[in-house]
Amino acid sequence: MVKKRVLALLACLGLALALPFAAFADMGPKPSVEVQTAGLDQDCWVTLLAEQTVIGPWNLPGAAMPDWFEPEEQPAWEAFAAYGDPDGYHFLQWQARVADASPATWSYMAPKHFKILFWFPQSGGYAVTEALDRYAYAAVYRVDFSGVDPAAGGVQTVTAQRNYDYGGEALGLAARFALTLAVELLIA
């Protein structure tokens, strides 16, 4: 009886050692694009138009809105899906509501080259930037709407300025490095 239990215990131990155990401590930065606004005084939605048609889980829209969107997001999804960019950039089904006090961030697999497209629900109009690039892991762009009339409808051109916080990003990098190192040392 004891012999069977010892053999069973050894078999379980052997199986446990044979199966790999993975430890993940990836706290590093992820490529992202943040869109900040200034002078925006009405409801607005934003997306990034990408050169590619697929980036990771992001792809071209189908005939119907995907299930992960909330019903109140449907008008914005339809407006972005209907927009035809003259330079061939594509809507990849990422969108967010944006305001001066709450920037929008595409934080997972953001495109490398893109345009920022805004949609104004009240007028149905758009505002679009020139082609931009993700110049850093946490690229930040600020768009000033002081000279833009969202009620005008149609497509207006806006300018996006880089607004990168070098000090804050350096501090964040140091903190992530320390946390990753601490977790790796605890696991090892």
Which role fits each region the language model picked out?
Residues 168-188:
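Core alpha-helical transmembrane segments of integral membrane proteins
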